[in-house]
Design a protein with these regions (language model features):
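Short acidic/histidine-rich active-site segments
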Residues: 56, 80-104
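Active-site beta-loop-alpha junctions enriched in small/polar residues
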Residues: 4-6, 25-28, 57-59, 90-94
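A conserved active-site cap/scaffold subdomain adjacent to cofactor or substrate pockets
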Residues: 46, 51-61
Length: 136
């Protein structure tokens, strides 16, 4: 789903018989890139029981800050995405990651940023591990 056009997305939603996965997508409301998901697209994935993997690629985050990356998380959580959001990364072939990240070794920085904003360990474990594990 992460590489589909809007029309292709909805075509697939109408024929999907299993949970839908957008393996590396962010919120278009936060960063208006055509590859990011609209709120309606996120809800369709959520309602299917699927997952959306947070994309760390700078051009889909919008700004090179941790706050910009966290804004995508908070937007999806505001759409009742606690059991939908997971990590997607899109680390292969990317020349620039958000928030000064250089690779997987920096993902704990996102965990710490969310923890500092008051998110519970249980919610963060869902986002960082359980939501994707539930699906696979």
């Amino acid at each position: 789903m992460s590489h589909l056009s809007d029309a292709g997305f909805w075509d697939l939603v109408h024929i999907a018989r299993r949970p839908i996965v957008a393996s590396h997508s962010n919120a278009r409301a936060v960063c208006p890139h055509r590859r990011n998901l609209t709120d309606d697209q996120f809800r369709a994935i959520r309602d299917s029981g699927g997952v959306v993997g947070l994309n760390l690629y700078l051009h889909f985050v919008g700004q090179p800050t941790m706050d910009a990356l966290v804004a995508h998380v908070e937007h999806f959580l505001a759409l009742d995405g606690e059991k939908t959001l997971c990590l997607g990364g899109d680390l292969d072939g990317c020349e620039a990651l958000a928030a000064g990240m250089t690779g997987m070794q920096d993902v704990p920085k996102l965990y710490e940023a969310l923890k500092a904003r008051g998110y519970s360990d249980a919610l963060l474990e869902d986002i960082f591990w359980n939501n994707l594990r539930r699906l696979i």
